[in-house]
Amino acid sequence: NAKVTGLDLSPYFLAVAQYRTRQRHYDINWVHAAAESTGLPDASFDLVSIFLTCHELPQIPTMEIFAEARRLLRKGGYFAIMDMNPNSENFKRMPPYVLTLLKSTEPYLDEYFTLDIEQALVAAGFNPPRIRENSPRHRTIIAQL
């Protein structure tokens, strides 16, 4: 009985999402907005999740998204993040030339890799998060309000 809302800044991605939603007969409310300022009502969600987003952004918008997630969540709600894991052995062992190539396609990777995500979430008002590896290069972060 969950009500699902999806959000994206790209009208093109939203058009694809709406098309696929209709194909599968899902009931999802798609919203065109920036994750930092959704315009959605305060305390209206039990779960907010973002997927492979933080590494695409500078630290300031990332922290703005954390604050927006906190605003959107009801007390006791969860914020789930899945993204690259800067502590991954795969990244640590990556030859410098490969890492340089990766960074050429990921301009904010250094900012993401230096972000203390646990501290940033606590500073945004969340309880200390649980962080788990979910693949050789990715992690899931769960923070409760």
Identify the residue ranges that each predicted region occupies.
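Class I SAM-dependent methyltransferase SAM/SAH-binding core
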Residues: 1-37
